[in-house]
C-alpha cells in the first residue's frame, strides 16, 4: 500500500522520471493528476510512430512488382521471396520486440525502433537507382525493413503499461487502429510518388510501361 500511495509524496513540480517511478494508473487520484496527461502524450507519439512503421513495412509490396520494369533481371521466385521477407521478419521479430519497452523504456523503444527504419529506407532508395545492385543486397535491405512490422508488438506493450484497465482497450484500439492506417496510406500514395518527378530531390527516373517511373521516391519521401 505504501508503494501504491508513493505518488502523494511527490513535490509540487515532479519530473517525468519521478512520476514514472511511482506509476499507478489504477489509482484515480494519480491518474487525474499525473497519469492521464503522460499516458495521452505517449499514445499520440506511439500512434504516429506506428503509422510510419506500417508505411515502411508495407512499402516494399508496392515496389517489388516494378523491379523488372526498371532494369533488375531477377527471377519470379526471387521477386516473390523479396516480397515475402518483410512479413516473415516482422512476424518473427514481434516475439522479441514485445519485451523491448520493459528493457529500455517505452520512449526509448519508440524512438530507436522508428529511427532505425531510416537506414533501410535510404538504402533501398539508393539500391533501386542502380540496376547492378545484387539480389543479396536487396535481401539484406528488405529483411531490415521487415523489423518495422515488429514495432507493432513493442508499441502495444508500451501503451498497455500506461493506461488503467478501464481505458486500456480504448487506448490499444486507437494505437492499433490508427497505426494500421499506414498500410492504406502507402497504397494510396505509392502510385502518386511513382509517377511524380522529384528528380531535383531524389534522383532521375527510368522509363516504364506507362511513362517515367521514380521508384526511389516511395522510399525517400517517407524519410522526410
List the model feature ranges, each with a label.
Residues 81-101:
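Central cavity-lining transmembrane alpha-helices of secondary-active solute carriers
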Residues 115-132:
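C-terminal ends and interior cores of transmembrane alpha-helices
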Residues 150-164, 172:
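Intracellular juxtamembrane helix-capping segments at the cytosolic ends
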Residues 149, 169-198:
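Glycine-rich segments within core transmembrane alpha-helices of 12-TM secondary carriers
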Residues 41-72, 186-190:
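Extracytoplasmic
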Residues 212-224:
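Symmetry-related core transmembrane helices of the 12-TM Major Facilitator Superfamily/SLC fold
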Residues 120, 134-152:
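Hydrophobic core of transmembrane alpha-helices in multi-pass small-molecule transporters
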Residues 1-55:
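Cytosolic juxtamembrane N-terminal segment immediately preceding the first transmembrane helix
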Amino acid at each position: 500500500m505504501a508503494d501504491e500511495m508513493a505518488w502523494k509524496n511527490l513535490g509540487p513540480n515532479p519530473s517525468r522520471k519521478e512520476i514514472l517511478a511511482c506509476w499507478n494508473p489504477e489509482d484515480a487520484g494519480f491518474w487525474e493528476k499525473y497519469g492521464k496527461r503522460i499516458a495521452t502524450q505517449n499514445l499520440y507519439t506511439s500512434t504516429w510512430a506506428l503509422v510510419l512503421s506500417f508505411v515502411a513495412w508495407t512499402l516494399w509490396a508496392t515496389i517489388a512488382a516494378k523491379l523488372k520494369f526498371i532494369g533488375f533481371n531477377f527471377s519470379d521466385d526471387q521477386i516473390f521471396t523479396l516480397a515475402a521477407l518483410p512479413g516473415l521478419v516482422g512476424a518473427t521479430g514481434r516475439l522479441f520486440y514485445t519485451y523491448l519497452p520493459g528493457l529500455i523504456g517505452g520512449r526509448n523503444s519508440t524512438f530507436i525502433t522508428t529511427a532505425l527504419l531510416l537506414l533501410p529506407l535510404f538504402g533501398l532508395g539508393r539500391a533501386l537507382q542502380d540496376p547492378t545492385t545484387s539480389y543479396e543486397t536487396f535481401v539484406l535491405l528488405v529483411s531490415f525493413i521487415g523489423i518495422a512490422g515488429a514495432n507493432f508488438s513493442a508499441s502495444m506493450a508500451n501503451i498497455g503499461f500506461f493506461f488503467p484497465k478501464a481505458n486500456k482497450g480504448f487506448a490499444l484500439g486507437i494505437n492499433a487502429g490508427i497505426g494500421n492506417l499506414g498500410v492504406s496510406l502507402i497504397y494510396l500514395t505509392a502510385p502518386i510518388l511513382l509517377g511524380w518527378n522529384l528528380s531535383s530531390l531524389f534522383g532521375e527516373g527510368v522509363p516504364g510501361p506507362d511513362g517515367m517511373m521514380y521508384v526511389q521516391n516511395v522510399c525517400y519521401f517517407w524519410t522526410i
